[in-house]
Regions:
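Short hydrophobic alpha-helical membrane-embedded segments
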Residues: 13-17, 116-119, 239-249, 366-369, ...
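C-terminal transmembrane helix pair
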Residues: 14, 186-202, 206, 342, ...
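Alpha-helical transmembrane segments in multi-pass membrane proteins
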Residues: 20, 43, 47, 51, ...
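Membrane-embedded alpha-helical segments and adjacent helix-loop junctions characteristic
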Residues: 59-150, 309-397
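Alpha-helical transmembrane segments and their lipid-water interface positions
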Residues: 83, 170, 174-182, 209-213, ...
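Transmembrane helix interruption/hinge and helix-loop junction motifs
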Residues: 153-155, 257-263, 382-383, 440-441
């Protein structure tokens, strides 16, 4: 690519984004919850084509540049897509085998409704710290907590908000987290130094979040004890509830603790759940298969939609699963989002818009605020948190050094802006995935993800206060 290539102005660069927002708004307004069935994907592809048209026609950007950028983006999310498909099989297997119903049954007896939201946030935070993966946390214990919360009468938006807030706190500060490792490495900050520095903004954000969830736990009206008893009875009538089923979550936790790769861990957990389904729930498998064929029932649980008539409408909705096939709309959306991100990068539009943020970087607060806004913008346009972290780190590293700020300030701000906001964007890989796993739309849970909303604001507030932000001699190494 020629270095003399004309770069689109920021105003022109905004045109594809304006079109995307407009088309997504129209799609959601028209199709509602069915927008992911194809409307959102067509919106992304149409906007991608519009971006390519502008670049090729007016700025002479060769098609090969677009092809390369899009290919790189898609290859970068290949692992995430495989994980997503396995999670589809795992969620079905954990449900039909009775693992999730068992967790729900005993969880209802242990967790008091008044403290449910705060407890959910803390549980997900602890598990996510240990696993280093918000996706794994949400796909396993998150689904069980969703069931407990629904049984207790909580709105699904509140439950999902508590689950995601806790899971992304853990994902953010865990030394096992890919985003944490990526943010520290891209800014050349030692991992544990990066984590310690993040605690300055992350801890108060979590405390505020827990206060909100604790207060709302007492305010929100929940179901009566009799209603929950009926729900528990329906669980026992439908599934074989036994503590033996908890061996699978235990084995999964051991594999995670031993740092077995996510794909292998999730696959083993899925297979173990399938075996448990054969041992403990053979009648359910026959019901799913529609005939006396347990093997067919297991396979259908892994790959397709399953429905059981439990006699309790809430429980019937809860135990319905979609398997790997249920993830295909999300996979399709991810691929289309990667096309849009690649087109914006290859055309130079992404760089043109982010350069606007750089112009406002004067003092300490504006430096951090510009980084936060840029990171959030990249999450919106590239639709992938890993790409956003890499671009934010590379884009601002020299600027931070020239202005005398430590690299750890950049690494912390990058995570505050990118990692935690990714599940709040409907077309971002994280937003799409969590909405699919929890079966709650992104816009439904967004207002209740207090940790994710507060974190970037806390980053700017701490910068304004100036706590632990030290300017170094401009040309000295760290």
């Amino acid at each position: 690519m020629s270095s003399l290539k004309k770069i689109p102005s920021p105003l022109v660069s905004l045109l594809p984004i304006v079109l995307l927002v407009g088309m997504l708004f129209a799609t959601i307004h028209t199709f509602g919850s069915d927008a992911l069935e194809g409307g959102s994907q067509i919106s992304l592809l149409t906007t991608t084509a519009f971006c390519v048209f502008i670049g090729i026609t007016f700025y002479r950007v060769p098609w090969k540049d677009y092809e390369l950028a899009i290919t790189n983006n898609i290859s970068g999310v290949a692992t995430a897509i495989i994980i997503l498909l396995i999670i589809g099989a795992l969620s079905g297997a954990w449900m039909i085998s009775g693992i999730v119903p068992t967790l729900i049954y005993y969880g209802m007896q242990i967790i008091h409704p008044d403290f449910f939201l705060a407890s959910t946030c803390i549980i997900c935070a602890l598990i996510s710290v240990m696993t280093g993966s918000s996706w794994t946390t949400i796909a396993t214990i998150g689904i069980a907590l969703m069931g407990i919360g629904k049984a207790q009468g909580f709105n699904e938006g509140w439950i999902a908000g508590a689950i995601i807030s806790g899971a992304y706190f853990g994902d953010k500060i865990s030394p096992l987290s890919e985003t944490t490792i990526l943010a520290s490495s891209i800014t050349d900050v030692p991992l544990f130094r990066h984590i310690r520095y993040m605690l300055i903004t992350t801890t108060p954000s979590l405390i505020i979040t827990l206060i909100i969830f604790t207060v709302m736990g007492f305010v929100i009206e929940t179901n009566s004890t009799a209603h929950m008893a009926d729900f528990a009875t329906s669980l026992k009538d439908t599934f074989t509830i036994t503590l033996w089923l908890l061996i699978v979550p235990l084995v999964t936790g051991i594999l995670i603790a031993r740092k077995v790769p996510s794909i292998i861990t999730l696959f083993i957990s899925t297979m173990l759940a399938g075996i448990c389904a054969i041992i403990f729930q053979p009648d359910l498998l026959r019901e799913i298969a529609g005939e006396n064929n347990i093997f067919k029932g297991v396979m259908m649980t892994f790959y397709g939609s399953t429905g059981l008539d439990t006699g309790n409408s809430m429980l019937t909705d809860l135990v319905s699963t979609r398997g790997m096939a249920g993830m295909m709309n999300t996979v399709w959306l991810i691929l289309c989002a990667m096309c849009f991100g690649g087109a914006m990068t290859a055309s130079g539009m992404l760089g043109s818009i982010t350069s606007v943020f750089v112009r406002f970087m004067k003092g300490r607060v504006s430096v951090v605020a510009s980084t936060v806004c840029s990171g959030l913008f990249l999450n919106l346009t590239t639709a992938d948190q890993y790409i956003s972290i890499i671009l934010t780190g590379n884009m601002f590293r020299n600027i931070y050094e020239k202005k005398g700020y430590e690299n750890r300030l950049l690494s912390r701000t990058t995570e505050d802006a990118v990692t935690v906001t990714s599940p709040l964007i409907p077309w971002n890989t994280c937003g799409m995935t969590q909405a699919t796993i929890l079966n709650v739309s992104t816009l439904t849970y967004l207002p209740y993800c207090f940790f994710n909303i507060i974190s970037p604001l806390m980053s700017i507030l701490v910068a304004a206060i100036g706590y632990k932000i030290v300017k170094r001699p401009v040309n000295n190494p760290e």
